[in-house]
Amino acid sequence: SVQVSHIRSRLIEHGLSVRHCIWEKSNPSPMNGQHMWLSSIENCVYARKKGAYHDIRERCKSAVWKCPTEKYKGHPTPKPISLMERLIQASSKPEDIVFDPCMGSGAVGIAAKRTRRSFIGIEMDEKYYNITQDRIDKAVSGIGEKVDITSFL
């Protein structure tokens, strides 16, 4: 999408190493009946500082990751927390900072906290920001951590 392309370009401009993988949904659901083919994949873009940690066990594996969609009613396109945890663990170490420029349902924030990373997220839609703030706060309260979430700007 245009938004992903724009974000990818900005990350590269700032000297980050940008990678791409595909999420293949093992249980896709149709958004509407007007399309002939069911969309069962989503592109994932992730970036890290050049020379930063990368889990050697993830090398030479397929860039297509199969994972079921997450059942979460607070957002139209929630990402699976387990998939976000895999991305985070493959490309960072505990105590590193994870940045999500499109927080959506908060899956990256929850995954970051579950894997002992700090988290910075941005969400343009105030409705989803508020939902995400509450969701992340509830998720991390179960692991004994407090979340400091800056108010919507």
What is each PLM-predicted segment?
Residues 1-130:
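Core catalytic lobe of class I
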Residues 133-153:
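S-adenosyl-L-methionine
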